[in-house]
């Protein structure tokens, strides 16, 4: 298994509130672990929230295997921290997490940070955004990609640290040879369309080179937000084309 993680402040923001973690090696009893968190909150609160979530989840999972309980436990601790310090009030973060075991991808998410599977030359979003616009789309009240959708797509309906209890969504996918997994913050997915992401991931080069290209593409298209990328190649195999 190969993995590479990279984050960038972007071209507009002065602070990077995205936080990443990638371990293709064992983390406690887990065979591997990959995380992206996107912080929100004024001043340094968002930066603190994303870092707190990732670092404390890794610590939790070094001693336990229950990803769901880990997310819930760290969420509660983050929420309690926001109550104790005035400068942290209202802070929170998104989270997308992945574990790969014996050819199976296990993914979890809260918010609008995403996990994509690149399989057989095509890209597919595995996670579902917890956002106002996606809820409207699901109810048939909004068209994805419409002007109203684009105006309101940053309104998220679920995030870590906002409430004492949280319910992450979980997904399971069987992997095949040649597949890639991409975890990212909305700084990538809001800037770069799926076909372009797919083409970059399937292009020649190392995972590091591909991660650099993804971030460069987001910055070329405006770089209006922090950008986080975790790119994973679980197994060896040939490359297709989008």
Where are these regions (language model features)?
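PP2C/PPM-type serine/threonine phosphatase catalytic domain
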Residues: 1-242
């Amino acid at each position: 298994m190969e993995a590479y993680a990279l984050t960038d402040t972007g071209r507009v923001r002065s602070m990077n509130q995205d936080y990443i973690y990638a371990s293709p090696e064992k983390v406690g009893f887990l065979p591997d672990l990959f995380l992206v968190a996107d912080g929100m909150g004024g001043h340094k609160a968002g930066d603190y929230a994303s870092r707190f979530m990732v670092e404390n989840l890794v610590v939790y999972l070094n001693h336990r295997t229950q990803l769901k309980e880990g997310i819930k436990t760290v969420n509660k601790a983050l929420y309690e921290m926001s109550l104790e310090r005035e400068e942290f009030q209202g802070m929170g973060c998104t989270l997308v997490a992945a574990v790969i075991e014996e050819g199976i991808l296990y993914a979890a998410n809260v918010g609008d940070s995403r996990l994509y599977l690149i399989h057989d030359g095509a890209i597919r979003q595995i996670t579902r955004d917890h956002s106002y616009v996606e809820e409207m789309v699901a109810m048939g009240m909004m068209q994805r990609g419409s002007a109203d959708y684009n105006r309101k797509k940053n309104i998220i309906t679920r995030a870590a640290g906002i409430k004492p209890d949280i319910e992450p969504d979980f997904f399971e996918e069987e992997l095949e040879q040649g597949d890639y997994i991409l975890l990212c913050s909305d700084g990538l997915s809001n800037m770069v369309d799926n076909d372009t992401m797919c083409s970059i991931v399937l292009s020649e080069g190392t995972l590091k080179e591909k991660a650099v290209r993804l971030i460069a593409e987001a910055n070329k298209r405006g770089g209006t937000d922090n950008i986080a990328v975790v790119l994973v190649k679980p197994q060896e195999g040939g490359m297709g084309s989008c």
